[in-house]
Structures are given as structure tokens and as C-alpha cells.
């Protein structure tokens, strides 16, 4: 096992060096480009890379991030895949209507991304889900199982055993009674200290994490009125665990190829949540990395290599 990890790390390092050597010769299709689309009257920002006739890979971000979290992953995949990374409403560079103007629920986020993909002409695709990306992505998968070619879950939970004590500490009381006292507790999750903790806790070398990551996310959280958006989604998250059984049924019946690559030191989603995918799909690939919640920040090259190997075996 140690030898396997050594060779995987060496391959990831070589892959990173190879990317650097061709940076100046990068083709237009491999370059990440930046766009907006009008979806149901909202401006949806998205990043795009790779040939449009290549297999599609849709990257679905978590909280409190945006497509910014995929900025280094996309060029590592775009020679072989058409990669799309949208920002949800209320996140990143997409529009942020008030909760009175847009219902901030995971059903509605999935509706918006579904309509975005229809508009882009994306009929078949693989999904990469992280954190909030999981309830969005699994809604898409259960609505349109014929469209999903593969699932990559990076700390994107779909099992009760994946929920760490964090959920009981901050959210269960709020779900039961969203009064001002319980709301104030949840509001602590919108501070810079909390955002930094998500990025740095469980990392081997926190000094390798660029402060651009958590400061970019925090700037979004501190926009006027954004706290109301996030509180609405925190409250709606209570509707996700009751859907887990239907997601498991989808995995058992439709059998999409699954790659679970998780930071095993995540304070929010436990490794047991990654291991549980093997229960519903014994063929699923599992890789537990010695890092945290935002695993791309520390192990992006290795994750890219695992994705390339996984999709190369499963997508034709």
C-alpha cells in the first residue's frame, strides 16, 4: 500500500511538471475561459475548458466556495474532457437575488443547473461533486439517470455515517427550530475564522494553501444580504438526509461508475461517508487522502491523475 501511494505521488508530481512544460504551448481549447449565461432570468457565471466534442465533465462546488475552487483542476483535465464549472446563484460571480426573489433550496439549485446544462446542449456528462455539489448532483442524477456517465465524489456526502459531529453542534437545533438563538449559532459559520478552518483543518501543510482561496470565498459571504442566502441553504439542508435512500437506490439500480476520493481529515464529512459508497457499488473506487475538506488545495495533481485514470477506464 505504501509503495502504491509512493508511485501515485510520483506520477502526480511528474504530471504537474509535464503540465508546466506545455503551459506556453497551451491550445485555445485547453485554456480556461470565463462566461455568463442567462438562465431563468439569472446571470449564471461559469468556467469552461476543453474541446466541446470531448466527453463532458460538470464540476459542482460546495460551501462557501464557487467554481474558483476548480481553477487549477480544469487545465489538468481539459486536454481530454470538456469541463464546465458553474457558480450557483448566490455564489461566486453568479447573480445573488434575495431569498424573496429566488428560493434558496437544493431543489431549486438543481433546477437552475439542470436548465443551465440544457442551455449548453450538454446531454450526457460525468459529475464531480464536493460538499453542496453532492445534493445538487444527486438530484440531477436521479432526475436524469440516462444522462450521467460517471460520478466523482470528493468529500461529497450521501450517507448518514458521513455526517460528523459538526452537524449536531451547529445545525440540528436550527433544523428543529430556526429561532434567533439557533440562527446566531449557525451564523458563526459565515465568519473568516470558520472559512479558514474549512480550508486548513486536517491539511498536512497548511502553509501550502493560498490565502486567496479562503479570502475569495469570504468576500462572497460578506456581500450585503449574502448571510440570508446561506442561512436559507443551511436550513434547507435538512431535506437532504431523507433523500439518501433514493440516492442509494439509484446507485444500486443504475450502477454509474463511482470514484470516491476524499480528504480523510475532513471535519465536516467523515471517511465513513466515502467508504459507504462501496456498500451500494462494490466496484466503486475509493481513495482516502491525508488532507482535509478542500482536498484540491493540497492534492490537486494527485486527484487530477485519479480522475484521468478513472474516466479513461469508464468513459468512451
Kindly give the residue locations of the regions a language model identified.
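Bacterial N-terminal signal peptides that target proteins for export
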Residues: 1-11
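Bacterial N-terminal signal peptides
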Residues: 10-21
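Structural cue for short, hydrophobic secondary-structure segments
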Residues: 59-62, 85
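Active-site glycine-rich loops that stabilize anionic/oxyanionic intermediates
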Residues: 62-65, 131
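Catalytic histidine-centered segment of alpha/beta-hydrolase-like enzymes
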Residues: 292-304
Amino acid at each position: 500500500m505504501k509503495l502504491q501511494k509512493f508511485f501515485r505521488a510520483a506520477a502526480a508530481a511528474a504530471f504537474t511538471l509535464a503540465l508546466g512544460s506545455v503551459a506556453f504551448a497551451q491550445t485555445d481549447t485547453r485554456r480556461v475561459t470565463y462566461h455568463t449565461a442567462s438562465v431563468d432570468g439569472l446571470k449564471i457565471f461559469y468556467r469552461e475548458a476543453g474541446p466541446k466534442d470531448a466527453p463532458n465533465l460538470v464540476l459542482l462546488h460546495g460551501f462557501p466556495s464557487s467554481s474558483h475552487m476548480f481553477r487549477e483542476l480544469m487545465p489538468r483535465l481539459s486536454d481530454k474532457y470538456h469541463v464546465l464549472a458553474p457558480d450557483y446563484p448566490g455564489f461566486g460571480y453568479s447573480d445573488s437575488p434575495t431569498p424573496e426573489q429566488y428560493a434558496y433550496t437544493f431543489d431549486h439549485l438543481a433546477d437552475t443547473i439542470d436548465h443551465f446544462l440544457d442551455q449548453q446542449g450538454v446531454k450526457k456528462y460525468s459529475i464531480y461533486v464536493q460538499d453542496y455539489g453532492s445534493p445538487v448532483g444527486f438530484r440531477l442524477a436521479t432526475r436524469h439517470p440516462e444522462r450521467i456517465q460517471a460520478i466523482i465524489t470528493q468529500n461529497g456526502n450521501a450517507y448518514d455515517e458521513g455526517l460528523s459531529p459538526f452537524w449536531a453542534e451547529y445545525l440540528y437545533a436550527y433544523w428543529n427550530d430556526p429561532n434567533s438563538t439557533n440562527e446566531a449559532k449557525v451564523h458563526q459559520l459565515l465568519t473568516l475564522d470558520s472559512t479558514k478552518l474549512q480550508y486548513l483543518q486536517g491539511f498536512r501543510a497548511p502553509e501550502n494553501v493560498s490565502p486567496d482561496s479562503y479570502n475569495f470565498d469570504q468576500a462572497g459571504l460578506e456581500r450585503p444580504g449574502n448571510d440570508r442566502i446561506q442561512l436559507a441553504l443551511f436550513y434547507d439542508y435538512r431535506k437532504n438526509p431523507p433523500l439518501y435512500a433514493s440516492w442509494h437506490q439509484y446507485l444500486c439500480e443504475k450502477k454509474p461508475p463511482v470514484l470516491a476520493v476524499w480528504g480523510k481529515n475532513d471535519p465536516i464529512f467523515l471517511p465513513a461517508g466515502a467508504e459507504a459508497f462501496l456498500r451500494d457499488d462494490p466496484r466503486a473506487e475509493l481513495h482516502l487522502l491525508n488532507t482535509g475538506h478542500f482536498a484540491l488545495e493540497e492534492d490537486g495533481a494527485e486527484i487530477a491523475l485519479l480522475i484521468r485514470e478513472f474516466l479513461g477506464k469508464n468513459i468512451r
